[in-house]
Amino acid sequence: MATASPSVFLLMVNGQVESAQFPEYDDLYCKYCFVYGQDWAPTAGLEEGISQITSKSQDVRQALVWNFPIDVTFKSTNPYGWPQIVLSVYGPDVFGNDVVRGYGAVHVPFSPGRHKRTIPMFVPESTSKLQKFTSWFMGRRPEYTDPKVVAQGEGREVTRVRSQGFVTLLFNVVTKDMRKLGYDTGPSDTQGVLGPSPPQSFPQ
């Protein structure tokens, strides 16, 4: 009896939000969520998460290390709307209010295997000095009501932003049945099964 052809393929993603560089800020935490097309659906794992608060390392790097795990599996019938991960970094201002310190997004790598990505972050800016002062005084900085707009792009061209910091991500990507559906993402359809990356740690 012939084996039925698969009707969907799987994309399995694990890894971690490893660390960040924000020279001007300390005591930060990170939120992540995935954005994907209408033909995609999560089948296992978590689509979003929030990390612990971390402080800068005491060495010359002054890195903010989270090592916050990512683990999610998607199914789809076509690659359109390939998942992106959206990051939002928050921390206290001088008044102790939680304010956004950076947004960023990147596509999940298309090829199976282990990947490292460093994402430049940005924050929305007020359009006038008066608005800047008012938002600083009131403790309410400009931010997106839905961080997922960072991955979508509509209306971004009319938003004033400022570059600020970097976040480093580690991905382990595995695909299943993409080749059977006619999609070629690499030498082997199930490559990418690797052991976990060692966590980044501070030098002794």
UniProtKB/Swiss-Prot annotation:
BP term (GO), one: neuroepithelial cell differentiation
Q: What is this protein called?
A: B9 domain-containing protein 1
Disease the record associates with this protein: Meckel syndrome 9: A disorder characterized by a combination of renal cysts and variably associated features including developmental anomalies of the central nervous system (typically encephalocele), hepatic ductal dysplasia and cysts, and polydactyly. Joubert syndrome 27: A form of Joubert syndrome, a disorder presenting with cerebellar ataxia, oculomotor apraxia, hypotonia, neonatal breathing abnormalities and psychomotor delay. Neuroradiologically, it is characterized by cerebellar vermian hypoplasia/aplasia, thickened and reoriented superior cerebellar peduncles, and an abnormally large interpeduncular fossa, giving the appearance of a molar tooth on transaxial slices (molar tooth sign). Additional variable features include retinal dystrophy, renal disease, liver fibrosis, and polydactyly. JBTS27 inheritance is autosomal recessive.
Molecular function in Gene Ontology: hedgehog receptor activity
Q: Kindly give the Pfam families that the UniProt entry links to this protein.
A: B9-C2
Q: Which UniProt keywords apply?
A: Cell projection, Ciliopathy, Cilium biogenesis/degradation, Cytoplasm, Cytoskeleton, Disease variant, Joubert syndrome, Meckel syndrome
Function, as annotated? Component of the tectonic-like complex, a complex localized at the transition zone of primary cilia and acting as a barrier that prevents diffusion of transmembrane proteins between the cilia and plasma membranes. Required for ciliogenesis and sonic hedgehog/SHH signaling.
Q: Where in the cell is it found?
A: Cytoplasm, Cytoskeleton, Cilium basal body; Cytoplasm, Cytoskeleton, Cilium axoneme
